[in-house]
Amino acid sequence: MSDAVTIRTRKVISNPLLARRQFVIDVLHPNRANVSKDELREKLAEIYKAEKDAVSVFGFRTQFGGGKSTGFGLIYQSVADAKRFEPAYRLVRYGLAEKVEKASRQQRKQKKNRDKKIFGTQRRAQKRAARRNAD
């Protein structure tokens, strides 16, 4: 961790519609395997005087031979803007949202096929019962 890490940003674009600045990040990390995204978020927040939670980094590729990685970064004007525009999976990654657990694919298919077997008056009665139970 004592090895120096250099962060350069290029192609910086201000995107007022999405309330963010977006740019390409070049990270020089000689004698080091890679730099964690969390560490990059901290350093970018420090450089651009923003909150760490308003910074998003992704899409990093390390060049052959190591020592240099290139990726993409976004800095939102506020954490609220980040929560509004960032994809849910990235918010989960950064700890800003909870992961939505859903039934497995097989369970969803089995339910769909079970529901297909009930039709006609039985189906109508089932919907009514479900509505009553919901109230």
From Swiss-Prot:
Keywords: Cytoplasm, Ribonucleoprotein, Ribosomal protein. GO terms for biological process: translation. One of its GO terms (molecular function) is structural constituent of ribosome. PROSITE patterns: RIBOSOMAL_S24E. One of its GO terms (cellular component) is ribonucleoprotein complex. Gene3D superfamilies: 3.30.70.3370. Disulfide bonds: none annotated. Residues 102-135 are annotated as: Disordered. The keyword Lyase does not apply. It is found in: Cytoplasm. Its main location: cytoplasm. Residues 105-115, 124-135 have a biased composition (Basic residues). Pfam families: Ribosomal_S24e. Component of the small ribosomal subunit. Mature ribosomes consist of a small (40S) and a large (60S) subunit. The 40S subunit contains about 32 different proteins and 1 molecule of RNA (18S). The 60S subunit contains 45 different proteins and 3 molecules of RNA (25S, 5.8S and 5S). Component of the ribosome, a large ribonucleoprotein complex responsible for the synthesis of proteins in the cell. The small ribosomal subunit (SSU) binds messenger RNAs (mRNAs) and translates the encoded message by selecting cognate aminoacyl-transfer RNA (tRNA) molecules. The large subunit (LSU) contains the ribosomal catalytic site termed the peptidyl transferase center (PTC), which catalyzes the formation of peptide bonds, thereby polymerizing the amino acids delivered by tRNAs into a polypeptide chain. Belongs to the eukaryotic ribosomal protein eS24 family. This is Small ribosomal subunit protein eS24.
